[in-house]
Each structure stands twice: as structure tokens, then as C-alpha cells.
Amino acid sequence: VVFVTRQDLYRQRAQFVLEFERGNIRRNSPEARQAKRIRDRELYYGRLMPFLYARCGGILGAFRVLLAKGIGLLRPMMREVSECDMRVTVNKSCALAAQTFMIAMAAEGYDTCPLEGFDSKRMKKLLKLPHGAGINMVVPCGMRDGEKGIWGERCRVPFDEVYHRL
């Protein structure tokens, strides 16, 4: 399974979610609160999301960083707003979707192994993906052969070394 990011589709995705939210609010919110809730969603999906996800050769990202620093002086503010930061955010969101997929596969008795370090340019060409698409990870799926790994015994860092209770 190949997990693909499509930051280039942010406008269509925002519009899709906005339309859903308008109907959702009309169906499930008290009539007295509907107008404000719809207005809030229109601000978020109609203006903020397009502003955050738009790309313009780094110029818009630099402006967003300055704006975030200024607003951050007055109130809590998400600071990761540069074009690079937004690309990282898109990839983290996709990785969370991949994680959910892998957990679901395990629940069905299948094993998965997320892969990084592949030739993304060739992979995009092979899959005929558009220029704006990015490959987040490749996840082979199957059933393990007992407890052995591909080349022998499996090795894991001890749990106590990577988990710290606060």
C-alpha cells in the first residue's frame, strides 16, 4: 500500500469539508447557534486553510512566519506555518492515517512494515502520480512466518529505553 500526500488539492479538500460542515451544523446544531458555527467554519475552511496551505516559492511562508510571531506575542499561536512546516504537517497527517491502517491490518491478523528510503521519483512515475503528489511511505502487507524476521531473528530496542513515564 502506498500512502500519497496531495497538498496541491488543499482548496478542493477545504471546500469539500466546508460543504459537509454546513450541512452537519444545519442537521445537528440548535438553530440559534447555526449562523455563528457556519461563519466560524467558513472562516477556517474558506480563508485560514487556503492561507496556510498555499505555496508561493517561500514568500508566502515567510510572511506567515512573521504574522505567526506577531500574533504569538499576544496569544497562543501555532508557529509552524512556513511552507516547509506545512509540508511536514501534511506528511505527519498522512503518517497518522498510515498508522491507523497498520493497526487495522493487525486487528485483522495481517502484518505490515512501513518503509522509507525508497526511490520516490521512480515510484511516482510507476504509479503515474501527478507532479503535486508526494509519497509519504510504502507499507508492505502480509502474514509473518512465525517469529523469525526476513534475515533471521528480530531485534527490538528494550521498551524501558524508549518509553518514559512522566
Annotate the PLM regions.
Residues 1-166:
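Acidic, surface-exposed loops and disordered segments
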